[in-house]
């Protein structure tokens, strides 16, 4: 199973496995994936709409679940991860990629604010320690955790989410008022460019 956005994990997985289910809350996003799959002649992709916290699949149904930059939209990450555990086969893998909270309160509130202004469906980015706790509490076993920095060019970053102009202006005003600590940590530039922390966690369900 592949969690979106924009189908990238879906298309990559479809070239290596017999069947992929692209799952998302957004009907529009699923339509985009279905059309792109047809254009690429990928016939092993199906789509399903729903919430991460209530997956409409049988127990032990999937070999792998991939979520790429979607978990920060989930309203209850713990519940979603417990659902992932339920639908994974014994020994099945979970791969989660997302923007990561820096953990430090001042930096965290800055990141959450610009994320929410850019996309009002944003709920929260989590720190690495929070991810480890949530995955452990879902009875999944972490095999690997990688963090990195993601450079973000401002114009394309807001364009991807079709952020309304008023909120784009609000982000720029908020950026311009950032403290020296925030500017340094996020490598914030005068043109709006900045970097975000990202995380990838590879975990599995006990066999």
UniProtKB/Swiss-Prot annotation:
CDD domains for the chain: AdoMet_MTases
InterPro entries: Methyltransf_11, Methyltransf_Superfamily, SAM-dependent_MTases_sf
Top-level division of the source organism's lineage: Bacteria
Listed GO MF terms: methyltransferase activity; S-adenosylmethionine-dependent methyltransferase activity
Family statement drawn from the similarity comment of this UniProt entry: Belongs to the methyltransferase superfamily.
Protein name (database record): Uncharacterized protein YafE
